[in-house]
């Protein structure tokens, strides 16, 4: 009897609230009301008045509201503001109540945008709160404009931050300064545990303060947080310093900015333990390699150049270059800016005018010393070389604030030119001191190595339409060579050009690192100095552990491009005629430029990819049907694990016998022929042959034929696949964009009913001519839904008039 008594007690409490609310409403009605042009409105219902009163006093009544019976609570939920509605979610679920419809209505009324049709919203509360956080942060929504958003007892940012899984920073880094401000410290701490994806869109030039705020934000969210993915979109003219800052922070490198306070979390983590020589390798984790000499020196340079008003003296030309073998080849191939030369920077004692040290420290070991170039007879050690910024300015200049910060970032990048591959020591010309191998950094006035730290890094990096200059490409390549935590890399329309050779070099070095986790690479661009198949071979050789490779080149390669110095070809270690070693590819997607492709090159990749499960060829053209048949024969012999095969925008009108070979001999689960002109020639003869092959194929589960001008006759012929004498297990059929009319679809539905095969899965009917007879189309779809799940649309078939004329 305890539960009914509690229920009655809560009901009585609610009645008391109702009575008080009624008296308050009656007293207000007794007061003279203002005249209204629309006339007096109907008085609200008693229950609604009670709900409003409860909602207005939730600060006092919250615990009582949570204990209300389900039917009463269900009527109060739509009257609560978003803060209490979010807080009561768990209680509502326990009582069997859902708030999803309320959150959806709030989205429609307040956000006033419609989600993408491709987006499947599983939780409208999380979606609303995430969008609400972004709008409040950017100042695009006024919380005081709607009582459902305004409550003095709650902070909009703090309350919604725990629902944020994806944050977008736009334009001039709006929101970064607000998030790192002290009043929002708890907001940032919550974001550090909830945020997984950080996106940058349409970035513009930003000031020093904004970049410093971004530095602190990235340090908190990536190094001490849970962010695992960073994506950059649509940045036509990247600001070098900002771009390099985002990349280096994403890779786990951290140096406090000039004048910034020490990181509280870093202090807590390092409190109570003494720094050691292996500090860098400990921060990398057990699976990450220790930083090499060039990287440590670059990080040390970043720490020492935070001095204001430090003048540089005019630089002399270097007597020897700091080179890496593969990088030097790349520079020879890709060329360098004629205005950019290698200049040695002034060391700290040269820049400040102080006296240099009287002696240089000894090398770390005899074996290390023996690999170095002979030291100069001059007793004074020469400064470390680096690239000069492409500003066109020479001579002394004052470095202050952002200038020093920008120089530090460039120092970090271009020291990479001195890194030797395969673990070899660096040749520093006449600098014989052991600074670069970490033996004594003080010989160049650098701090101890412990001043530079590397923290947690992201696992997914995406660059969409972000042109990469030579400096930016060098930055990316250097970071990639030791970025062992990276699992997925997407480079889309970045204008790499000849920098693709540097990228391949860095990926090859990364693949050799212990614990390398890169398993997915998505690469697309307008042009490539290598033909797409040679580029694919080079990538597969460089990354034998890759699981997913998606590559697209829109325009043909030009080997005789005058931009390549002396018409030099690619390095011999990047392309070659030797056999491709066995790899771990499971998914391969290729988008080809116009022009016939050499089938043997594609076959060589397929032969080395015995684990391939999914293959997609887009716009591929072969010299003859025999070449296409050679590819299919290779798939049959070497790719026994292949489950999904897709062809898009390929002219297969002359490859009908090869298509029949595919259907009869490959044990696939899904085949896609998208806009392949499959039935353009001999449809009356080819369709029955194709249907017969499919009826005997018991492994095929999905067939996609969009854009092949199937028509009513072809659809009715295809219906025979589901006849009683068929052994086909087809359960997914896509016949979108196939000039199908309502009467043909109705007859197709009747045949399926006649054979009584039962539900066979999904049927897609997008962009067909079903609007020519709406009644017949509805009847056909009604009959089909008894057999399968139908997905269609209300497409205007007049848009396909040109296609109709071409089939007459």
Curated annotation (Swiss-Prot):
A single GO BP: protein ubiquitination
Biased amino acid composition, Low complexity: 357-379
Keywords, ordered alphabetically: Leucine-rich repeat, Phosphoprotein, Repeat, Ubl conjugation pathway
One GO MF term: identical protein binding
Modified sites of kind Phosphothreonine: 327
Annotated LRR repeat ranges: 483-503, 514-526, 527-551, 609-631, 632-655, 697-724, 727-748
Positions of the UniProt region annotated as Interaction with Elongin BC complex: 45-54
Transmembrane segments: none
Record-linked InterPro entries: Leu_rpt_41, LRR_dom_sf
Keyword Phosphoprotein part of the UniProt annotation: yes
Pathway: Protein modification; protein ubiquitination
Signal sequence bounds: none
Biased composition (Basic residues): 383-397
Role according to the record: Probable substrate recognition component of an ECS (Elongin BC-CUL2/5-SOCS-box protein) E3 ubiquitin ligase complex which mediates the ubiquitination and subsequent proteasomal degradation of target proteins.
Protein name: Leucine-rich repeat-containing protein 41
